[in-house]
Amino acid sequence: MSAFGIRQLDHVNLRTVNLDAMTEFYTEVIGLRSGPRPAFPFPGAWLYCGDTPVLHLVGVEQALHPREPQIEHFAFSATGLDDFTRRLQRHGLDYRRSKVPGTSLTQVHLRDCDGNHLHVDFEGQS
């Protein structure tokens, strides 16, 4: 029996009233791909990075309105900073680039169709 230890974040699950638009955003803009999903009794999509389903979208009829968001952001690591920013520009999306002090990490901050904050991180690229 081995000792317990977290290896990595497995996936993020987002509820959305805009299932088609969110699926398109995360495939066309972010570069994930749609893939197999179990036959749950509710609408949704699983979006993959390589062979791993990293984003689960669940279609809902009505948005929840919490007083304050419970998740401030989530992030992806990536390569091809210039390619990515050109992709955002082609899609007419607002974004903000920032450097993490004391590191070689560049972050590109943006919001998806539902207003969720995410950033895409590029190590050693500026």
Stretches found by the model and what they are:
Residues M1-D20, D51, I71-F74, S126:
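N-terminal beta-strand motif that seeds the catalytic metal site of vicinal oxygen chelate
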Residues N13-V54:
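Core segments of cupin and vicinal oxygen chelate
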Residues G59-V60, E123:
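Residue-level structural signal for beta-strand termini and adjacent loop
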Residues M1-G5, T85, R90-S126:
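Vicinal oxygen chelate
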Residues D51-L55, E61-L64, L81-D83:
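Short, charged/polar surface micro-motifs in flexible loops or helix N-caps
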Residues Q8, P41, Q70, S104:
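Exposed loop/turn and edge beta-strand positions of beta-sandwich/beta-sheet ligand-binding modules
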Residues N18-L19, T79-L81:
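Helix N-cap motif at beta-to-alpha junctions
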Residues F40, G50, L81, P101-T103, ...:
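A short, compositionally biased micro-patch
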